[in-house]
């Protein structure tokens, strides 16, 4: 049986020693939190607290997900890193594919992606993305991600994205798992 060390909101200075200790203890995976920003005001309720309050997130330091994964990959050798949960549809999918492929390449395929839509309208607003169509956008993002991380030429023509026939390298030597 394989286990993942799930860490969410600790001081980022502790991530490297925690990842090393988790690897030494036999853990197969290590989660990395994802957050882009914290709004000063919001009408959106947090779905995982009884009262919908998310003030506990205010001031928490979240290192950019792929940078954190690359940094942790440099100080470990076997443990797999999984952003949990990467807010995929607020990001350009071609950039996510490039970032993920680069981390997978540098870490010998030790990256998986936990992806979701984000319940926060503010994440979409400040990234210039329509919140109302996030589900369909996420579907397109996953298709683009899979295609661009394949190591083959790929093109995509959808409702939100239009990508000419391109190839991204380096490509991971194994498919990057998507956990939805």
Give each language-model segment a name.
Residues 1-75, 171-176:
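N-terminal beta1-alpha1-beta2 module of alpha/beta enzyme domains
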Residues 40-41, 51-54, 70, 79, ...:
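Internal, glycine-rich beta/alpha segment that forms the wall or movable "lid"
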